[in-house]
Design a protein with these regions (language model features):
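Active-site-proximal alpha-helix that buttresses catalytic centers in soluble enzyme cores
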Residues: 2-83, 87, 136, 140-143
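A glycine-rich beta-strand to alpha-helix segment
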Residues: 107-128
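Long, internal stretches of domain cores in catalytic or enzyme-like folds
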Residues: 75-80, 93, 105-106
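Short phosphate-binding loop-to-helix
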Residues: 84-100
Length: 157
C-alpha cells in the first residue's frame, strides 16, 4: 500500500446549538470565520498539499470551514453522514481506506486525503491512525489541523 497523506481538520467555531433547531444548519461565528481563514493561511505557509478528495459531513459549519480553509481550489468533495458528529468513525475510516486504494493519474506524488469534520469522530480517527499524535493533540480543538503521512494505511485498524 502506498504512502498517503491524511489531513484531519475540525470545523471552526459555530453558533450556539440552542439558536438552531437543526444541528446540521449551525453556521460559523465571526470568530469561526477568522479561524477558518487562518487555517487557509496556515495551509499555504506550511505547504500542506492540495487534497485529491475531501470527506465531510455536509453540515453547514464543516462546509464553511472547508470553503475558507481550501479557498480558491477546485475540489472533489464527498459528503457522508459517517463524517458527522453522529456518524461511525469506523465506516468513515473504511471510506478513507477505499479512497487510498484508488490510483492517481500522476504516479510521482503522494495521494492526499482531507477530512473536515466534527468531534468526537475527528479525535477518534486521529487516535486510530496515530495514538501518539492523538495523545498530544487531545483535546482536538476547533479549527485545528493534523497533517499525517501514513506509510502503511492498511495497518491502521
Amino acid at each position: 500500500m502506498p504512502t498517503v497523506q491524511l489531513v484531519l481538520v475540525r470545523h471552526a467555531e459555530a453558533a450556539d446549538g440552542s439558536l438552531f433547531g437543526d444541528d446540521s444548519q449551525r453556521e460559523l461565528t465571526q470568530r469561526g470565520q477568522r479561524e477558518a481563514a487562518f487555517l487557509c493561511r496556515t495551509r499555504r505557509m506550511m505547504s500542506v498539499p492540495t487534497p485529491d478528495v475531501v470527506f465531510t459531513s455536509g453540515y453547514e459549519r464543516a462546509e464553511q470551514t472547508l470553503e475558507r480553509a481550501l479557498e480558491g481550489l477546485s475540489l472533489r468533495i464527498v459528503r457522508d453522514i459517517n463524517f458527522s458528529p453522529e456518524g461511525s468513525y469506523r465506516k468513515a475510516w473504511e471510506m478513507i481506506l477505499d479512497e487510498s486504494r484508488r490510483p492517481l493519474k500522476e504516479e510521482d506524488r503522494l495521494k492526499c486525503i482531507w477530512v473536515v469534520g466534527h468531534n468526537p469522530n475527528i479525535e477518534r480517527l486521529l487516535s486510530l491512525v496515530s495514538p501518539e499524535v492523538s495523545a498530544v493533540l487531545r483535546p482536538f480543538r476547533k479549527a485545528s489541523l493534523a497533517w499525517l503521512k501514513l506509510r502503511d494505511v492498511e495497518s491502521h485498524h
